[in-house]
Amino acid sequence: MLVLGIETSCDETGVALYDTCQGLLGHTLYSQVDMHREYGGVVPELASRDHIRRILPLIRQLFRQSDTSLESVDAIACTQGPGLAGALLTGASFSSALAFARNIPVLNIHHLEGHLLSPLLSDPAPDFPFVALLVSGGHTQLMRVDGIGQYRLLGETVDDAAGEAFDKTAKLLDLDYPGGKLLAELATQGRAEQFRLPRPMLNSNDLNFSFSGLKTAAALLIGKHEMNSQTRADIAFAFEDAVTDVLVKKSVTALNITGLQQLVVAGGVGANSRLRQKLLHHLSGTDITVFFPALEFCTDNGAMIALAGALRLQQLDERLRAGGSFTVKARWNLEDL
């Protein structure tokens, strides 16, 4: 069965084709980063309008590159939420209309489920069950994943998400948009011994996170020093070091509590090289295996949505619906699946 995946939850338009026998046939992605840069962040109305412009040309490009056609598609999987309501409506309405015209079903996919399952696009892939660290601009969660749709929250941020803290601290350092990625690049030039920032909730008796206070501590540190290129790099290093220390410690604790021996790291911050290095170093010599998505699948993309749709299609998922009607969920708890 061939599934067309469509992702429009924020500022990337992603489409992909996933075959239940052959795997991923192809995917195309358009990022709106350049458009939003002058505003210093995502403008929801502009994001929605750009999805409308991009989605059909991207699908045509996808079919050409994959040497297939719409007539071969058995179902469409689209992101139903969470995300920006207008952006979600663009993908959902397009998916529903296309499915109605072709008389094929639509699967509503949770955006975070797509991220959780994205390492399954790579080889080797994890087996169920596993612990997942889902870390992005909007979410920081530890989940126990026992199967498709079987997700249990172990811990989450009580305030800012890790990616959000990266972006906000990047603004304090006068970095351009997207700030989190630029902060990580700047941190590679920083010196480890110059500054140390707190590790919030590092030793708490739960698996929750907090990054708001760390951002405030970084702001106070920036205010105390005259900024030059080296000082900015040193502070970036200290900030990234603190965030990744917390993420690693909590992930290892989750593995110890659950007794599971597989860790999946997913979401945009999962591309962070220092986080990857620390996890691999900390877990080397143990029986625990860490799985990272390919870098192209860390950001929002259609491939993870097509994959999630294909897996649910194989299970004859109850959310399978006919084209012609649709709803979106700007807020949606992953445990409610």
Swiss-Prot record:
The keyword Glycoprotein does not apply. The keyword Signal does not apply. Its main location: cytoplasm. It comes from the Bacteria. Required for the formation of a threonylcarbamoyl group on adenosine at position 37 (t(6)A37) in tRNAs that read codons beginning with adenine. Is involved in the transfer of the threonylcarbamoyl moiety of threonylcarbamoyl-AMP (TC-AMP) to the N6 group of A37, together with TsaE and TsaB. TsaD likely plays a direct catalytic role in this reaction. NCBIfam families: gcp_kae1, T6A_TsaD_YgjD. This is tRNA N6-adenosine threonylcarbamoyltransferase.
